[in-house]
Amino acid sequence: MITEIDASLLEKIADLTGKPVGAFNIRKDGGCEARQSTEHIAIDPQPEGKSGIIIRIKDGTKGEQCHIPVIISKSGVTEIVYNDFYVGENCDIDIVAGCGIHNSGCNESRHDGIHTFYIGKNSHVRYSEKHYGEGDGEGSRVMNPTTIVYLDEGASIQMETVQIRGIDSTVRKTKIVCGKGAEAVITERLLTHGKQHAESDMEIELNGEDARGRVISRSVAQDESKQIFHPVVVGNSKCFGHVQCDSIIMGKATIESIPAITANSTDAQLIHEAAIGKIAGDQLLKLQTLGLTEEEAEDTILKGFLA
């Protein structure tokens, strides 16, 4: 049964306001709340003894969506979930994930999601994942996502990961392996506040000729929170890779950004950029002259930066 709290979480992490259209799996408090397959997208449980789902998408599937949100509204729920995606050839689809935790108790609530994608030739996947935490209890809200992607020839993935707020601790690991002519774009947006801690390791391995990879990371660290980023692009053939990390630091926060590029081929073209700084005073002043308070001006700038 979906409660008001559950519905609010689903809207925040997956933009759902009712039953999803198409294939979906809604996981709640460690179990399956609802599931639906379609003619082209089959969702089945993992074999006994392993938590999670297997998603199989038929060759040529285009214009369909698959929603797989996770919500935890009970304090003390901890889980490790394995989701495996098998995307056929010549597909063009959207996969919407995300995890929301409401913890009003005194025990830790934790979700560790391990997603593995096998994307077939000339298929294009757009994958989005939002993380959000709330609740007035003393129990922490923890999320540790691991995402591994294998791209076949001519395939692509556009991955957007967003941490909205309220996650006390997160260790995020992402690895994408690109075949010939494949393309991977990772866009990460992250906000931490209070004494929260966030680590993000991202690696794109460009193995095939003419493979392309890009990492775009934007983050805001407020109060006494800490962020550590380690984006890596490895070029093993004629390829192009770009890493761009931009962060805004506020209060007594700490940010470490350690971008790395490795070329193992003379035909690899790799670029990395990283910047950390505070909000410019002239930006605040300009908005305040338009009638905004300093707090409202900061909020407006941060929303635009993370958009």
Predicted regions and their residues:
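Conserved beta-strand/loop scaffold segments within soluble protein domains that form the structured core
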Residues: 23-28, 33-285, 289-292, 302-307
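C-terminal functional modules
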Residues: 1-25, 30
